[in-house]
């Protein structure tokens, strides 16, 4: 039996931040790319468990001069994760003959969303999340 390790972001899940960026712009923010946002918040702190989801959302909200509903912001933040159906099907097929493990740099909000929408733990024997481990994968 072979062990197979999948990264979650940009492998099993695509990143599509348009809704988040649009929400920020609608409230006076100037972010044009996801990198514009992540370079101005403590994403590493969030993805290593030192900054919880609500604190991260407050940091993102501060990027726009006009107030943003935390509910709308959270929905836009998690909505950027889009499951890649073909890759999830591949992981499912491989899991029938191999041991599958998942690695991810993720925070609590994204993980809760992925578990609800995709049920990623069903694809793997184990998952190593950066926010639980306290360190980021390379």
For each feature predicted by the language model, list its residue ranges:
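Active-site neighborhood of HAD-like aspartate-dependent phosphohydrolases
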Residues: 1-39, 62-63
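A structural micro-motif
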Residues: 2, 98, 122-125
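Generic structural signal for small/hydrophobic residues in well-ordered secondary structure
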Residues: 7-10, 49, 94, 102, ...
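Hydrophobic alpha-helical core bundles mediating ligand binding, dimerization, or RNAP-core interactions
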Residues: 20-21, 56-61, 73-77, 110-114
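A metal-dependent, Asp-based hydrolase signature
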Residues: 43-74
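Short, acidic loop-to-helix structural element flanking the phosphoryl-transfer center
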Residues: 71-101
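Cofactor-binding loop segments of dinucleotide-utilizing enzymes, especially the Rossmann-like FAD-
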Residues: 105
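Substrate-recognition "cap/lid" segment bordering the active-site pocket of phosphatases
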Residues: 108-138
